[in-house]
Amino acid sequence: MTQLASSYDPSSFESRLYAQWESAGHFKPSGSGEPYTVLLPPPNVTGTLHMGHAFQQTLMDALVRYHRMRGYDTLWQVGTDHAGIATEMVVSRNLALEGKGETRDTLGREGFIAKVWEWKAQSGDTIERQMRRLGTSSDWSRSTFTMDPQPSAAVTEAFVRWYEQGLIYRGQRLVNWDPVLKTAISDLEVENVEEDGFLWSIRYPLADGVTYEHVEHDADGVETLRETRDYLVVATTRPETMLGDTAVMVHPDDARYATLHAAQIVLPLTGRLVPVITDDYVDRAFGTGVVKVTPAHDFNDYQVGVRHDLPLINLFTVTAAINDNAPERYRGLDRYDARKLVLSELEDLGLLVETKPHKLQVPRGDRTGQVIEPYLTDQWFVKMDALAKRGLELVESGQVKFVPPNWINTYRHWMENIQDWCISRQLWWGHRIPAWFDEAGKCYVGHDEAQVRATHGLGAEVALHQDSDVLETWFSSQLWPFSTLGWPDAQAMDERGFARYLPSSVLVTGFDIIFFWVARMIMATDSFTGQVPFRDVYITGLIRDAQGQKMSKSKGNVLDPLDIIDGISIEDLVAKRTSGLMQPRMAEKIEKATRKEFPDGIIAHGADALRFTIAALATHGRDIKFDLGRAEGYKNFCNKLWNATRFALMNTEGAQFSGVPQPQTETERWILARLDAVAAEAQAHYANYRFDLLAQTLYEFAWNAFCDWFVELAKPALNGAVQDAADSTRHTLLYVLEALLRLLHPLTPFVTEELWQQVAPRLGITGDTISLQAFPQRGDVDTSGYAGAEADIEWLKAMVSALRRVRSELNVPPSKQVRLWLQAGSSDDRARVARFASQLAFLLKLEAIDWLAAGQEAPPAAAAIVGELTLLVPLEGLVDMDAERTRLDKEIKRVESEIGKCNGKLGNATFVQNAPAAVVEQERARLNDWTTQLTGLREQRAKL
C-alpha cells in the first residue's frame, strides 16, 4: 500500500478513485435490501452543467451513497433531455457562428436534425464528464436520452393511449406564439414584464346614424358635459389589433349605453360592421366602460368570442407580420410598423382622441425575449381537468410528500387553475406527433403509418402525410419515472426492474419546475401505471451568486462546477463567460465584472470541498447565495482531515487492531459517546433532508471534537508510560477516525476513500472500498455508562479553553510554562483536577498546579472562572498590571452582557410559559453560572 502523501492534493487521486469505483461496478444496483431509487432531472443537452445542476446532483449523490452504505438496493437513474426549443436555438446559433451559410432552412429537416444529433453527442459527453468529476455514483450503463428508442416508443404509446381515451384532441385555439422561434410555447415559458407604454383612446363611429346622449360628471357628481354623440371611445394599448376587432362590448347594466345594445359600429380603417354586445366581463369603472373585442389576439377576448359566437380574424403571420386578412396597405408590415400606420391614419381621420403614458404587463418569451403574440392556430392539446383532479388527490392524501410541505400550496394553486395543455410545437427536433392526414384532411393516430393503414383499411393508393409538428419537451419528460424502466415493453420492464424500482424514493428538484415537470409526472405516472412516480419530492432553492443575483449566461455570472473543482485562469474564465452570448454587446461589461471578482482566476478546490459547501448551504425553503469563500473554508476542512489521518497513522505505525475498542481513559469514552450521538444525528438529518444541519454536525464533530480536542487530549496517553492506556487510545483513535470517514463519505467521497484505504487495514477491515461499508449506527459502540466521561471531558475542555484565553490575552508565548493557582471549587472540581493533572499540565504548559487554602490571599493574578472554580495565573513576570486591569474590565463587561441576555429571556413571560421546561431550566442554570463567574471576576479586579 502506498504511503499517504504529506499534503492534501485532490487532483492527485479524485479522477483515479472514480475510475476505480466505476470499473469495479460499485454504482450498479446490488444487494438484497429494500430498493432506493433516485431520479435525476435530466439536464438539457444544451451545453454544460451549471451550479444549479451541481447543487441538486450533490444532494442526490449524498442520498444514494448514504442508502447504499445502509444496504439498500440503490438505483440512481441518470440521463439527458433533448430540450426541443432550446436545442434548436443553440444549434441554429452555432451554424450562424460557423459562417458557412448553413441555416435550418437551407439544410432542410433531415439535414438539420443530423446536425443536432452531432451536437448532442458532443454536449452529452461534456455533461457526463462533469457529473463524473463531481463524483456522481450513478449506473452509467442505464443512462437514458429522451430521444433513445425505448423512451421514444413510450412517448408514442402515451400519445396513442390518451388519444384513444379522448384526452388528446386537435383544435384551433389561441396559444402563446413566439414569432422568432415560430412556434407555440407554454404559459410557463412566458415572462410578464412591466414596461412603459401608451394608452391610445380611439373613436369608433356608430353605424346607420345612431346616436346617444353622452353625459360626464366631476368628482362631486356635478354634470360637466352633455352632448349627443355618434361614436364610442375605446382605449387600447395595441391599436394595430383593431384591424381584427369583431365586436365592441359594454356592460349590460351600464345605463350610459342602454340604448346601444342592438347597435353596430363602423370599424375604423376597415369599414367592416361589428356589433355592440353586452357582457359582464366589462369593468364599468375603467375608462369609458367600452371595450374592443379581438378574439383572435387576446385570451380574454377569445373567451368572450366563444360566448357570443363572434368571428375570429387572425391578423398575423407566423413572424408577426400583417397577413391578408387586413386591408391591402397593411399586408406584410411588421406589427410595430403596422401600429405606426394605424395611428397615423387615425390621426388624419380625426379619430385619435388621446395618447397618454401607461404602465403595462408585456408578455415576453423566456428564451428569445420577444413579445409573445396570442395566436390562433391548429394545435394538439391534452384535457387536464380529470388528470389534475387525480394528481391533487395523490398529494393531498399523502401518497406523494413535498419537503418542505409549504410547496403543496404552490402545487395546489396550479392544479386548481389548470388549463388544457398545448403539447404541439412547430419544430423539427423532438418526438414527431404520431398522426397522419389524408388529402381530405382527415386525421389518423397510431404507432406508425403501417398500423394506421392496417387499422383503417387504407391502401397504398391513399396518400398520407405525417403531422410535421413535434411534441413539446415536457411531454416526454413526464414519462421519465417509468419510461426509463422499460415501459411499455414487457420484456424491457422486466429487465430494467419496473416492478422493483417504481415508485422511486425521492425526486430532488427546484421549485421552478413543480408544474412543468413534477405535477405532470404525478399525473402521467398515475394515468399509465396506476402508481405514483415517487414518494418524496424534496424542493430546493435556486442557486444565486454571492450578491443574490440569479446565475445566467446573459448576466455573465455563471460558475462552472469544474472550474471550482479544477481551477481556471482569469483569461480562460473571461473567454468562457463572454463567448456565445445572445447579446454580444454585454461582453465588455461581463469581462470587467469578472476581472474585478476573480482577479487571479479561481483556484482548484477539489470536488469534496465543493460538495461539502453545497450541503452546508442547503437550507430549507430559501434560495442559496453561493460564496466561493465557503468552498475555500471547506477545502481547509478536507486538509484538516488529511492531517489528522497522518497523525493517526504516524502514531499507530506497526499496530494492528480489530473490533470495538475497550476504552481505558475518560477521553476515549467521551469521543466514543460523541461518535454514537453524531451517528444518530446524521441519520435523522438524512431522513429530514436537512443537509445543512448534517454538514454542520459532521463539521463540528470532525474539526472540533476529533481534530481539535480528542487528538490533543489523547497525546498524554499516547506518549505516556502506561502501555494499556496508550494501546487503547491508539485503537480508539483509529476506530473513531475510520467511523468518521464513513460518516463523511456520502458528502466527501474522494478524500474519505483515499484516507480509508490507509486506515482500514490497521483495523482488520476487509473490502476494497469505503462506499460499500456500513454507515455508522447508534449502538455500534455500547456507550451506556459514559455520561460521566462526557461531563468530565466537557469540564476539561472548559478549563483548557479558559486558560488558553488567559494566555492569549496576556500574550504569553506558547512555549512558556506558567503556574496555576486554583481557588474555591466543588469536590467534583478537586477530584477532576487530580484525575486530569497530567493532561492539564501537558495542554497548558503548566509548571505547577496549586490550591489556595481557605482564607489564603491570592497573589496578583489573571483570573478565569469555570463553574464554581477560580483559575489564577500569577502575573509576576508575565504581564503589565494595567493591561490585566483592561482585560478584566473587558471580561466583566462580556459576562454582564450574557447575564443581561439571560435575564431578558427569563423576564419574558411568553418564553417562560411556552418554552419547554428543560429549556427554561437550562437558561436559569446558565444565569447562575454567569453570575458566579461575575462575582469571581469582580473580586479579582478589586485585588488589582
Swiss-Prot record:
CDD domains: Anticodon_Ia_Val (cd07962), ValRS_core (cd00817). Monomer. It is found in: Cytoplasm. This is Valine--tRNA ligase. The keyword ATP-binding applies. NCBIfam families: PRK05729.1, valS. Catalyzes the attachment of valine to tRNA(Val). As ValRS can inadvertently accommodate and process structurally similar amino acids such as threonine, to avoid such errors, it has a 'posttransfer' editing activity that hydrolyzes mischarged Thr-tRNA(Val) in a tRNA-dependent manner. ATP binds at K553. Keywords: Aminoacyl-tRNA synthetase, ATP-binding, Coiled coil, Cytoplasm, Ligase, Nucleotide-binding, Protein biosynthesis. It comes from the Bacteria. Its main location: cytoplasm. The keyword Cytoplasm applies. One of its GO terms (biological process) is valyl-tRNA aminoacylation. A motif ('KMSKS' region) lies at residues 550-554. One of its GO terms (cellular component) is cytosol. HAMAP family: Val_tRNA_synth_type1. A motif ('HIGH' region) lies at residues 43-53. InterPro entries: aa-tRNA-synth_I_CS (IPR001412), aa-tRNA-synth_Ia (IPR002300), Anticodon_Ia_Val (IPR033705), M/V/L/I-tRNA-synth_anticd-bd (IPR013155), Rossmann-like_a/b/a_fold (IPR014729), tRNA-bd_arm (IPR010978), tRNAsynth_Ia_anticodon-bd (IPR009080), Val-tRNA_synth_C_sf (IPR037118). Pfam families: Anticodon_1, tRNA-synt_1, Val_tRNA-synt_C. Its EC number is 6.1.1.9. SUPFAM superfamilies: Anticodon-binding domain of a subclass of class I aminoacyl-tRNA synthetases, Nucleotidylyl transferase, tRNA-binding arm, ValRS/IleRS/LeuRS editing domain. Residues 878-944 form a coiled coil. PANTHER family: VALINE--TRNA LIGASE, CHLOROPLASTIC_MITOCHONDRIAL 2 (PTHR11946:SF93), VALYL-TRNA SYNTHETASES (PTHR11946).
